[in-house]
Amino acid sequence: MTDEEPADRDDDSDSTPELELDAVYDAIDAVGRPHLTATEFSRKTDLTPDEARAALERLADDGDIERQDVSEVESVWYPTDIAEVTDRERVVLFPDRREVVVEHPDQFTRAQLSQFARLQDTNRSGGYVYELREEDIWAAPHESLDDLLTTMRDVLGERSPHLEEWVTSQWERARKFRLKTHEDGYVVLEAESDDLMGNVARPKLDDDHLRAPISDSESWVNEDATAEIKRTLYEAGYPVRDDRDLETGDAIEMDLRLRLRDYQQDWVERFTEQGSGVFVGPPGSGKTVAAMGAMAAIGGETLILVPSRELATQWRDELVRHTSLTDDDIGEYHGGEKEIRAVTIATYRTAGMDRHRKLFDQRKWGLIVFDEVHHVPSPIHRRSADLQTKHRLGLTATPTRESDDEEEIFTLIGPPIGTDWGKLFDEGYVAEPEVEIRLVPWGDETEQSEYSSTSGHDRRQAAASNTGKIDEIRYALAENPAAKALVFIEYLDQGEAISEAIDAPFISGETPHARREKLFDEFRRGELTTLVVSRVGDEGIDLPDAELALVASGLGGSRRQGAQRAGRTMRPAGDARMVILATRGTTEEDFVRRQMRHLASKGIRVTETEAEAVEPPAKTE
C-alpha cells in the first residue's frame, strides 16, 4: 500500500453521490414502512451498500434524515419529518382485481381517478380504494382511447399491459352498436359485425323494437322503441352510441347576455357535436348558464324539466336575466301554471302524467333539458326518458342514486361532459368545500338507552335526533359567526327543536309555497343568516351565498343528498364548509362515511373529528 492510497479514498468519499431526499422517500415507499436500512436503500437504488451508507450519512449531516442504531452492525434511517412519510401519497395497482389503493391522495389524483374508476371504500387513516368497472370505461369523458390510457398512466405511475388490454376491450365494446338516421329518414341500428347483430341484438330485441332487417349488420328500428333498445343492449353489456339526426324543432331567437367561461364553452361545443350529453360539475360551476349556451347553439324550442316549482321559477328568472328571452317567450307547466310556449319549464311529475303527456309529445321540441337529471331513473320520472328524438341535455352534480343505476342516465340521456372537478377547484372557478364528519356524544343517557332498546326506523331516528347535536350546532355556528348557514334535518320534530333552539326559521314540505319563497329570498339578500331546512332544500334551490352547511341527521340522506348539501357552499368565491353530525358509536357513523364517498371520489378531502361534550350556554335574564 502506498502513501497516496488514503488520499485516494478521501477523494472517493468526496465523490459520494449527492442524492435528493426524494430518493429516500421513494425507497421507503418501496419497502412499505417509514424507515429503512442502508442495505435496503442500496437495493432500491443503483448504489453499492457502501455508497448507499455514505449517501445516507451525508443526508443525516444535512439534517434531512435521522439515524437509529438497532444493533452493533445495523442502523435504520428515517426522514426527520416523519409526518411527511406517513402522509405521503402512495398509489398501488392490483390489475387482476382491477383495483387501485391510494394512501393520502391529493385532490388532483382523486379527480383523475374519478374519470375512469369508482370509489369503493375509504378509511380513517387516509386510504382510498377505487374499482374499475365496465360502466366507468364506457362513460369515461375522453375523446379517444389514447387520452384515457394517458390519464391512467399519469395517475397510476406505471403501465399494466393486462389492465390496459381490458380497458381497451371495454372502450371498443362501447362502440359496437350505434343508432343512425338512414338517408330516407328512418332510424337504423348498426352493428360492427354480422355476428353481433345476429347473435346479440336480434335475439334480445323483438318485433316491437326492430321492424325489419336491412342487411346482416343493420336493422330498421321502431322509432318509439329507441329508449328500450338502448336499455336492453346496455344490460347485455353493449352501450349504444346515438348518432341520429335529431330534431331541432321550430326556431327561436335567443342570445346570451354573458360570456361563457372557457370550460363552459367546451361543454357546449362537445354537446352540440354529440347531440346529447350530461353536464356533470360541482354546484357553482355554472351548469345552468352552460345549458343556456346549449339552447342558443341548438336554436330550437326547448322543454326544461325540473323537480320542483321553485326550480321552475328560478329557471324563468335566470333565462330573463341572462338571455334575450322575455317573460312572454317562457311558459311554466306544473301544478301552479299551465302555459306552453317556445321555451317551457315543467316539473317531472306533471310532464309524466297521462293527461298531460300528449301536450309535450305533440310539440316539436328541439331540445329537452333534464335538470337534476338523477331524477330520471326513478320509476315516477321514467317517461321523460322516452323523448328520444330530441337533443337531450342533462344537468347534475351527482348522478348517483342509491340503487346504483346512474348508468341509465348516461344511456338514455347521453354521455358525461365536464366531469373534472379538480380542475375547477384549482383554477378558482369553484370553492372547494372543507368537509368534516363530526362524531357527537349522546345528549343524555336516556336517549342512549332508548337507542339501545329499539330497532329499525325507531333506532335510526333516535341516532339522528340526538339532542347533543343541538349544542354542537350552536358551537359550529359560534365557530363561524359571520357565515350564512344552512342546517339540514331529516325529521320534522328535530327541525322544530333546532329552529327554536337557535332562533332560525324552519322550512319543510309543510311550509306554504309563498312563505318558502319569502324566506329563501331573505336568505339570498342577507336579511336572514341561518335557515333550518328539510329535504325541500336539497333539489336545486338557489342559495348561492351559503358558506356553511350543517347536516344534523345523516341517516335519512343519500350520497346524492350529501353532495347536494355540500354543494350549497361550493361557489366561486369565499370560504366553504360542511359539517356532518353523526352520533358516536351508532350505525349513523358508518352510514355518513359511505354517504361522503361521492365527494371524496371527486377530489374533495373529507376529515373526521371527535366532538367533545358541549355545555349549553347559560341563559341570560
From Swiss-Prot:
Residues 441-465 are annotated as: Disordered. Its EC number is 5.6.2.4. InterPro entries: AAA+_ATPase, ATP-dep_DNA_Helicase, ERCC3_RAD25_C, Helicase/UvrB_N, Helicase_ATP-bd, Helicase_C-like, Helicase_Rad25_arc, P-loop_NTPase. SUPFAM superfamilies: P-loop containing nucleoside triphosphate hydrolases. The keyword Nucleotide-binding applies. The keyword Hydrolase applies. It comes from the Archaea. ATP binds at G281, P282, P283, G284, S285, G286, K287, T288. It catalyses: Couples ATP hydrolysis with the unwinding of duplex DNA by translocating in the 3'-5' direction; ATP + H2O = ADP + phosphate + H(+). This is Putative DNA 3'-5' helicase Rad25. The gene is rad25.
